[in-house]
Amino acid sequence: MTILHDKQVQALKLFEKLSVAATGEPVPADQIDERLRNITTLGPNEFFSCFYPDHLEQAKRVYEVFCHAANFDDFVSLAKQARSFMNSTLFAFSAEVALLHREDCRGVIVPPVQEVFADRFIPADSLIKAFTLATTTQPGDESDIIVDVKDTGNILDPEYKLAYFREDIGVNAHHWHWHVVYPSTYDPAFFGKVKDRKGELFYYMHQQMCARYDCERLSNGLNRMIPFHNFNEPLGGYAAHLTHVASGRHYAQRPDGLAMHDVREVDVQDMERWTERIMEAIDLRRVISPTGEYIPLDEEHGADILGALIESSYESKNRGYYGSLHNWGHVMMAYIHDPDGRFRETPGVMTDTATSLRDPIFYRYHRFIDNVFQEYKKTLPVYSKDNLDFPQVTITDVKVKAKIPNVVHTFIREDELELSHCLHFAKPGSVRARYHHLDHESFSYIISAQNNSNADKQATVRIFLAPTYDELGNDISLDEQRRLYIEMDKFYHTLRPGKNTIVRSSTDSSVTLSSVHTFKELLRGEDLVEGQTEFCSCGWPQHLLVPKGNEKGMQFDLFVMLTDASVDRVQSGDGTPLCADALSYCGVLDQKYPDKRAMGYPFDRKITADTHEEFLTGNMNISHVTVRFQD
């Protein structure tokens, strides 16, 4: 066993069966390491939230202790002690942050959260059935147990048409891991490193989630979502049917018609006041610091400053004045049924980064947040032809190579999730949940380009996809459509003088995870190579790269743009980039975001052109692609 493999195995043991009583003897209080002794944390049965300030501060103290450990063995020793008495979710979050940011953990892969906390992904009735089957097997029976995941809703709720997307295991795992890679309490002073454009990435990743959700809504014959816009409006209901096994209690449901109320720490008026102050800062194009200084919201840094302000994170320029609009919104919605805690009810799924994407209100609230960012984008000048053009480079044709040219087929695929690393079934053998998810056929982009110069040109290839028609079958105006464009890929390519053909597989997307490593694979040491690119588990699931489309075939506009890579490139750090798997949504760990352009360029700003033809420059091209769902 290599040193790296040994580290991997030790790390995995920290996450085994966290949802039940910790394995091994608890550490006596007087023997707990003094570095952990004075940290006050949540009780073991409470619901940890990456949005609740007190919980975040507790986790910050824990992961900073882990990161300060003298060496890997010291870290593991501290972590073993911590897991014996700490809240399991708080511990897992803190341990993952440490694994990703400790130098001596380079190459160690964080385990899939869907196996660590399977109870956040698999409905309670399926887990109960698994327990029932496991406890009624004959002694010595080591055969596998497989339970089917049942539906969590029905056709009485129109929103249930989107359950395949909102409740997708890969999507929710991505959201958990993104907030591990980019914790809002990340302190650059402690780590000695600034996470480049972290605030802007917060804006862009969530904007893309909203765009993808609206694409799925149109695929299913639903209207695009109505953004949340009123803190006093009654909200639609949602029931996740998930159980928080560590406490033995359900994530609370939200009945139809409840409105947000004051919680103990924050009033609804605070939320309205923070929104007004942020909007005023956008109108004035500057934010005010605690000392009264003005910080401009310029073209280069404005989105990053706003992202930190709205989330809010440690990089917020003035949290006392601008508050924490995003995080407290999650908390208020999670406790909408018991805002002051008088009934001691558990929160809803909006409290947890591993579950919040299941709730339809997540997308409506984030569209509201995105609308705030769009107000800032309106203050920026419209991209001129000079901002968009790539002199002497033209795209002559764009095609999609699939079984049928320019037609991508989607379908439902069956998959399984191992439960035995989360729960103790008191039997040997595997216990798995069988579920279904959307998937698509593999395809390739074929891009024909012309380099009219006499020298090689380095190009950045940018690929986006958006629906052509709205819910009524009308053409979507370009300025509306720009907010529906989902990024499909972004990569560098060398253009030789003359004609060029660029071929790119959908499986190489800069948006998606290349693969998901299971506990079993990691324990065997698969894909562990010293010095290789580290795997952060952050990235959009490959199976949801393409929207569902419909049975008739739904038309999308495939937009391809070539830009000058010599202008786009940033100066990278030394060595192999870390966590560079899904760089569009997740960036590159410990290095600058690998694109100088604004995230979402060229669709991040208002477009005054009425048609694609009016907007396009020679280095762009539009192709019509059909996405057809096969049931």
Curated annotation (Swiss-Prot):
Per the entry, what this protein does is:
Hemocyanins are copper-containing oxygen carriers occurring freely dissolved in the hemolymph of many mollusks and arthropods.
> Which positions does UniProt annotate for Cu cation 2 binding?
326, 330, 366
User: Domain of life of the organism in this record?
Assistant: Eukaryota
Where, per UniProt, does this protein localize? Secreted, Extracellular space
Q: Where does it mainly reside?
A: secreted
Can you name this protein? Hemocyanin A chain
- Binding-site residues, Cu cation 1: 175, 179, 206
State the family it belongs to: Belongs to the tyrosinase family. Hemocyanin subfamily.
Q: List the disulfide bonds.
A: 538-586
This chain is encoded by the gene named HCA
Key words of the record: Copper, Disulfide bond, Glycoprotein, Metal-binding, Oxygen transport, Secreted, Transport
Q: In which tissues is it expressed?
A: Hemolymph.
Q: Subunit structure, per the record? A: Tarantula hemocyanin is a 24-chain polymer with seven different chains identified.
Q: What more does the record tell us?
A: The two copper ions bound each have 3 nitrogen ligands (presumably contributed by His residues) and share a bridging ligand (possibly contributed by a Tyr residue) in addition to binding oxygen.
What is a GO molecular function of this protein? copper ion binding
What InterPro entries would the database entry show?
Di-copper_centre_dom_sf (IPR008922), Hemocyanin/hexamerin (IPR013788), Hemocyanin/hexamerin_mid_dom (IPR000896), Hemocyanin_C (IPR005203), Hemocyanin_C_sf (IPR037020), Hemocyanin_N (IPR005204), Hemocyanin_N_sf (IPR036697), Ig_E-set (IPR014756)
| Any one of the GO CC terms | extracellular region
Q: Please list the residues annotated as glycosylated.
A: 38, 87, 451, 621
